[in-house]
């Protein structure tokens, strides 16, 4: 089975909570989501994956792609069930603003994360969810 995974973000530290997804969309060239855990996909290579992941959006979906490649953002994804079981699904949002006009965001970042390399930028969100595939 294949599913669309759409991710949105809210700042619950303010009252009322504020949807900040539009800010990520506006700064698409400076943000990238990574899906890891018991997953196989661009940013993960689990030995016994329960699901596969692929990006379904690009920076140009949210506005003009002004710098470099038209890279995934990760707000829209395709998830496919591979095997039944229990595990974890981790969602990491990184902020990757340019440094001295040089982009930090690149197409190699998902594979860098999968191979254990340190990523540039800062972590905006890092959440782990229980994953059950039946």
Regions found by a protein language model. Name each.
Residues 3-9, 71-112:
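Internal, hydrophobic beta-strand segments that form the core of beta-sheet-rich folds
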Residues 19, 42-49, 104-113:
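Acidic Ser/Thr/Pro-rich low-complexity disordered segments
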Residues 46-81:
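A beta-strand/beta-hairpin structural motif
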Residues 104-134:
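Short beta-strand elements
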Residues 11, 97, 131-133:
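Beta-strand elements of well-folded, non-transmembrane domains
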Residues 1-45:
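Extracellular-facing segments of soluble proteins and assemblies that are Gly/Ser/Thr-biased and enriched
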Residues 1, 25-27, 83-85, 121-123:
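Solvent-exposed loop and beta-edge segments used for protein-protein assembly and interaction
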């Amino acid at each position: 089975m294949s599913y669309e995974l759409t991710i949105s973000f809210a700042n619950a530290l303010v009252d009322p909570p504020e949807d900040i997804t539009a800010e990520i969309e506006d700064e698409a060239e400076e943000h990238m989501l990574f899906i890891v855990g018991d997953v196989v996909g661009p940013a993960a290579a689990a030995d016994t994956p329960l699901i596969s992941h692929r990006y379904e959006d690009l920076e140009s979906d949210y506005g003009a792609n002004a710098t470099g490649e038209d890279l995934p953002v990760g707000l829209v994804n395709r998830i496919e069930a591979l095997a039944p079981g229990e595990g974890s699904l981790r969602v990491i949002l990184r902020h990757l603003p340019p440094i001295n006009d040089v982009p930090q965001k690149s197409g190699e970042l998902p594979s860098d994360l999968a191979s254990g390399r340190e990523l540039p930028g800062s972590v905006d969100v890092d959440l782990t969810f229980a994953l059950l595939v039946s």
